[in-house]
Amino acid sequence: MGSFSIWHWVIVLVVVVLIFGTKKLRNVGQDLGGAVKGFKEGMKSEGEDAAQTPPAAQKEGGRVIDAEPADKK
């Protein structure tokens, strides 16, 4: 009870193939693979963009003002 044997998964796979057909499943697999590939490329380019951009504190021409807040009256 609670755990599925290999035969349960085989039956589920057969039912899914009968309902959707192999062509539809292949198209879904291609779409899913393309989405994963696009996501990985996006993450890779995001990492490269972050490495090329200097942090805000290290940008040239900026200045830091050290002050304390004034009391409101």
Swiss-Prot record:
One Gene Ontology biological process: protein transport by the Tat complex
InterPro entries referenced in this protein's UniProt entry, alphabetically: TatA/B/E, TatA/E
Function comment: Part of the twin-arginine translocation (Tat) system that transports large folded proteins containing a characteristic twin-arginine motif in their signal peptide across membranes. TatA could form the protein-conducting channel of the Tat system.
Keyword Aminoacyl-tRNA synthetase (UniProt): no
UniProt family annotation: Belongs to the TatA/E family.
HAMAP family: TatA_E
Localization annotation: Cell inner membrane
One Gene Ontology MF term: protein transmembrane transporter activity
Compositionally biased region (Basic and acidic residues): 60-73
Protein name in UniProt: Sec-independent protein translocase protein TatA
Leader peptide range in chain numbering: none
Organism: Laribacter hongkongensis (strain HLHK9)
Gene, per the UniProt record: tatA
Keyword Cell membrane: yes
